Every structure is written in C-alpha cells, then in structure tokens.
A protein has these predicted regions:
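Non-catalytic signal-transmission and effector/linker regions of two-component phosphorelay proteins
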Residues: 1-17, 23, 120-136
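Two-component/phosphorelay signaling modules centered on CheY-like receiver
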Residues: 23-41
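Active-site residues of response regulator receiver
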Residues: 66-68
Length: 136
C-alpha cells in the first residue's frame, strides 16, 4: 500500500542533493541533471550533505545518496540522521550504490528507491522525475 501512496505523491519542486564521494560520478550526475532542468547541489562527504540539508530543509526535493563514503559520516549515517529529523525525514531519498545492503539494513534505511551502480543515465532520470519537477 505504501508504494501506491508514493506513486500518487506529486513530484516536488526544489534542488536535488547529490551525495557521492567520487568526483567524476558526482560531477557527471550533476551535469546530467542540470542539462535536464534540475537544480543540483552536490556534496562529497556526509558531513557536507547534512550541513546542506540542515541549512535549507525546505529547499530540497530529493536526496541521491551513496552509502559508502570515506570519513566519519557515511551515507547510512546521513540517512539515519535524516530519518530522525522531522524537518528532513520527508525528503524523498534514492540510494545510489554499488553494494546493496542486507535486508535488515535496507529496511532500516527506508529509501524511496534504489539504483544500483553502474547505472544508465536514462534510468537515473526516470527515477528522479518520479520525485522532482524540473525548474525549466
């Protein structure tokens, strides 16, 4: 039933936060999304992503989240913090990862969608358009 509710939820307006530690992947995703009319904010580390989210919780329409990140705050930590915060919990989150976690972790993260790396840009755009209205 929850999937039906999610499918009926209209796309949101706002920026897409791309959290990805690899510069080439993060920049490629940002450029692709910007070319298709989306506003993008990117972060290379978990702490930076949380700073962006906390600074403007209403400004984000979607979080594209890589789980494996170097440093003290990885993607799982970002998602846990997001779910604990009433201001951030309702921001749709799509996990973009090369390693799909076990069922328990996956259930705990409660992501709206999952995209497995490597992915096709068309597949990414298809998922993003379910949640975000382009700014054009």
């Amino acid at each position: 039933m929850d999937d039906v509710t999610d499918a009926e939820r209209p796309p949101r307006r706002g920026a897409i936060l791309v959290l990805e530690d690899r510069d080439d992947v993060r920049q490629g995703m940002a450029q692709l999304l910007e070319l298709h009319g989306f506003l993008v904010v990117d972060a290379a580390a978990g702490e930076q992503a949380l700073d962006h989210l906390r600074a403007d919780p209403d400004g984000f329409a979607l979080l594209l989240l890589d789980l494996r990140m170097p440093g003290p705050v990885d993607g799982r930590d970002v998602r846990r913090s997001q779910l604990k915060s009433p201001d951030l919990a309702d921001i749709p989150t799509v996990v973009v990862t090369a390693t799909v976690p076990d069922g328990i972790t996956k259930a705990q993260l409660r992501a709206d969608a999952w995209i497995e790396k490597p992915f096709r840009f068309d597949d990414l755009l298809l998922v993003v358009r379910q949640y975000v209205t382009p700014n054009t």
